[in-house]
């Protein structure tokens, strides 16, 4: 345990194009092997395509898509008297964003279809689906909420 108190979260600088921290976090999630310029190209093109599809501002569309993916509840394991219970808990705001971005990128990478889809097309389609409250990332959120709802009886074990 550190003696200097809780660790302060780092200040994340906004991205240069949209001047938004969420876009910067998405770029970092998409990035593989330190190839940031490639990740930026993927995200910016996907956002431009999303804006064309929705007819909305790209930043507004992204924020709405992320808002539709953010989980409010999740289950955490808690050991009580030799057995482990899945206890539903509220998700802190920072974790909501990080889970939403993780699920979005994961769903985009796992997305398949006929032909060779690029990551740009996959991310665009997944963002569009999330914008319209459907898709794999939104399903993951609903599954998480369903699991929390099913284990509501163990909510009194919260710590």
From Swiss-Prot:
GO terms for biological process: translation. The gene is rpsG. Part of the 30S ribosomal subunit. Contacts proteins S9 and S11. Keywords: Ribonucleoprotein, Ribosomal protein, RNA-binding, rRNA-binding, tRNA-binding. It comes from Persephonella marina (strain DSM 14350 / EX-H1). One of its GO terms (cellular component) is small ribosomal subunit. Belongs to the universal ribosomal protein uS7 family. The keyword tRNA-binding applies. This is Small ribosomal subunit protein uS7. CDD domains: uS7_Bacteria. It comes from the Bacteria. The keyword Membrane does not apply. HAMAP family: Ribosomal_uS7_B. One of its GO terms (molecular function) is structural constituent of ribosome. Pfam families: Ribosomal_S7. One of the primary rRNA binding proteins, it binds directly to 16S rRNA where it nucleates assembly of the head domain of the 30S subunit. Is located at the subunit interface close to the decoding center, probably blocks exit of the E-site tRNA.
């Amino acid at each position: 345990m550190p003696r200097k108190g809780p660790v302060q979260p780092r200040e994340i600088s906004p991205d240069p194009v949209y001047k938004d921290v969420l876009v910067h976090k998405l770029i970092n999630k998409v990035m593989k092997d330190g190839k940031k310029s490639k990740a930026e190209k993927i995200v910016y093109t996907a956002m431009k395509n999303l804006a064309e599809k929705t007819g909305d501002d790209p930043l507004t569309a992204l924020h709405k898509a992320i808002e539709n993916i953010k989980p409010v509840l999740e289950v955490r394991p808690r050991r009580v008297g030799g057995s482990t219970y899945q206890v539903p808990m509220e998700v802190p705001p920072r974790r909501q964003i990080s889970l939403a971005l993780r699920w979005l990128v994961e769903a985009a990478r796992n997305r398949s279809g006929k032909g060779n889809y690029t990551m740009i097309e996959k991310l665009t389609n997944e963002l569009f689906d999330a914008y319209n409250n459907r898709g794999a990332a939104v399903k993951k959120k609903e599954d998480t909420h369903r699991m929390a709802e099913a284990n509501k009886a163990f909510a009194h074990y919260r710590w």
